[in-house]
């Protein structure tokens, strides 16, 4: 070859590599309202991790509403998860953390298809993790958003404060926050992250007017909060609740300052007792300052999912500003955002109970005792443990999901119900049904991360099916779109559910548990509603 031509070809090759490099760099960057970010590309998916959506909630910002991020100059690396929120990791967590927890934790993550540009207006999905409000984070491998991005979704996951960092009340906090932005800091974090999405997701190619929120367990309960909070107005257009209850019985809610007769203590009184346990007396400014100076480990204590039912921790509360009422009261009053909803539970979901006998168990149904016996134990020969679990699971998880779907269907909003009955091939000798949270790696199609060498082709097929339904719902509001098995809308008349079965894939059917849920609904609906919380002055959200 002529030397001159070699030089030209070499120059062209170098230019091509340079242009490719520039193109990749451009594709891996995004400009937010706080500064520029540089992400990473893996398998044709771009991710931006550890993106701050609020100032670190430390020091004087402990127990305050999320505050604006301090802008940065230059381009910030966004290639690794930032710390999950402060907690004592739970050894048998279904979603083990990938970071060391820290109080400085208000960060989110974004995945998108490679080559996505600002203005592409891809649908957005916003994930809220579970963990009983004391555990969880956005770093677990099973929460990786890559498979959603591969389906044309801009996927977002965000941290929120946990334990006493996320839920805490104290008399001086009430005095210094007359606008009512107190107590439920975890929910404020979720709203702040959604507001960040509204302001910034277009820079990542997402459509801020097409956001679907979804969460599991405590994350699902959080979705109920968002559906019924005035501060979440307009931040999303669809919602998915996985094993998140739907009445007032999941979050253990209480009021900030008021203790109800025969009800739980006020959150403030719990905060005062916690302060005393730390050697801090009084309820004024000096006491609050001392509380804010406590080491994070002291505030955290030993709280996790195994120890959360202990004195000194309030959990979610009704504050009259962020959370106006428990979900059941809000839904029955018509105080929820009119959006399509998809809800469901697992076939062996949470159902713990302590009734010592069948007589005690069925006595709890009052005048519906006979109907309950016929629905749950028609032969009278079922083991107590199995019947007790089914009764408590239905009351805690399954019937509340149907209740919410019924409310939305009555408002002519699309509502869809699922039951996840599939059990991984490697776990079938151990699990008689699908336990709580086991649907997550199928929804995310991260079964490889969950089961590794024990993964079977059937597991992968179910994961692909569930992912496709969730994506279809996020894109169109109808999970049937593009899927081989139609998912009928739920109505009280048809009671149709989509069962992700152990052996037959997705099956749409009339709910075989209808009689169980009907009798459970009869006793739950007859319970007196919770009274309204004390009034607080209305004010606009800070962010």
Go through the PLM ranges and name each one.
Residues 1-6, 397:
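Positively charged n-region of N-terminal signal peptides that target proteins for export
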Residues 2, 25-184, 453-466, 475-484, ...:
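Non-catalytic accessory segments of hydrolases
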Residues 90-281, 321-325, 329-356, 410-413, ...:
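Serine-hydrolase-like catalytic core of hydrolytic proteins
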Residues 161-164, 214-218, 419-426, 485-491:
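Short, solvent-exposed turn/loop segments enriched in Gly/Ser/Thr/Pro and often Arg
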Residues 209-212, 279-290, 302, 417-421, ...:
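Surface-exposed patches in mature extracellular/periplasmic domains of secreted proteins
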């Amino acid at each position: 070859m002529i030397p001159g031509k070699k030089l030209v070809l070499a120059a062209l090759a170098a230019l091509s590599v340079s242009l490719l490099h520039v193109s990749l760099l451009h594709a891996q960057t995004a400009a937010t309202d706080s500064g520029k970010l540089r992400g990473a590309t893996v398998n044709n998916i771009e991710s931006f991790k550890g993106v701050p959506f609020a100032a670190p909630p430390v020091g004087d910002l402990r127990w305050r509403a999320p505050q604006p991020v301090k802008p940065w100059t230059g381009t910030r690396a966004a290639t690794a998860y930032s710390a999950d929120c402060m907690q004592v990791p739970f050894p048998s967590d279904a979603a083990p953390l990938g970071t060391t927890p820290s109080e400085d934790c208000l960060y989110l993550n974004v995945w998108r298809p490679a080559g996505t540009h600002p203005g592409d207006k891809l649908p957005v999905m916003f994930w809220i993790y579970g963990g009983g409000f004391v555990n969880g984070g956005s770093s677990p491998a099973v929460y990786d958003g890559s498979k959603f991005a591969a389906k044309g979704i801009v996927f977002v996951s965000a941290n929120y404060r946990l334990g006493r960092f996320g839920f805490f009340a104290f008399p001086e906090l009430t005095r210094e926050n007359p606008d009512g932005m107190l107590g439920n800091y975890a929910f404020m974090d979720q709203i702040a992250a959604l507001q960040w999405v509204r302001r910034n997701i277009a820079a990542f190619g997402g459509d801020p007017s097409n956001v679907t929120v979804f969460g599991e367990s405590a994350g699902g309960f959080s979705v109920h909060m968002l559906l019924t909070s005035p501060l979440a107005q307009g931040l999303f257009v669809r919602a998915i609740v996985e094993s998140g209850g739907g009445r007032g019985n999941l979050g253990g809610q209480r009021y900030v300052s008021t203790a109800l007769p025969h009800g739980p203590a006020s959150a403030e009184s719990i905060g005062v007792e916690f302060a005393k346990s730390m050697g801090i007396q009084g309820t004024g400014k000096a006491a609050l300052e001392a509380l804010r100076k406590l080491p994070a480990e002291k505030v955290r204590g030993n709280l996790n999912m195994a120890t959360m039912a202990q004195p000194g921790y309030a959990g979610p509360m009704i504050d009259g500003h962020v959370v106006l009422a428990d979900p059941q009261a809000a839904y029955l009053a018509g105080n929820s955002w009119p959006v399509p909803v998809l809800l469901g539970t697992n076939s062996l979901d949470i159902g713990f109970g302590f009734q010592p006998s069948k007589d005690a168990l069925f006595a709890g149904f009052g005048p519906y005792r006979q109907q309950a016996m016929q629905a749950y134990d028609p032969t009278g020969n079922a083991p107590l443990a199995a019947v007790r679990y089914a009764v408590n699971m239905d009351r805690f998880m399954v019937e509340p999901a149907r209740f919410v779907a019924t409310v939305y269907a009555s408002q002519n909003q699309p509502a869809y119900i699922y039951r996840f009955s599939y059990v991984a091939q490697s776990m079938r000798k151990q699990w008689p049904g699908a336990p709580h949270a086991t649907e997550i790696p199928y929804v995310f199609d991260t079964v490889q991360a969950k089961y590794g060498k024990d993964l079977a082709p059937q597991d992968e097929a179910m994961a692909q099916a569930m992912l496709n339904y969730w994506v279809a719902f996020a894109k169109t509001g109808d999970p049937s779109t593009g899927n081989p098995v139609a998912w009928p809308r739920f109505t009280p008349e048809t009671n149709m559910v989509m069962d992700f079965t152990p052996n037959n894939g997705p099956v749409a059917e009339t709910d075989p548990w209808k009689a169980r849920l009907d009798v459970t609904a009869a006793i739950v609906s007859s319970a007196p509603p919770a009274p309204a919380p004390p009034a607080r002055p209305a004010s606009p959200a800070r962010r």
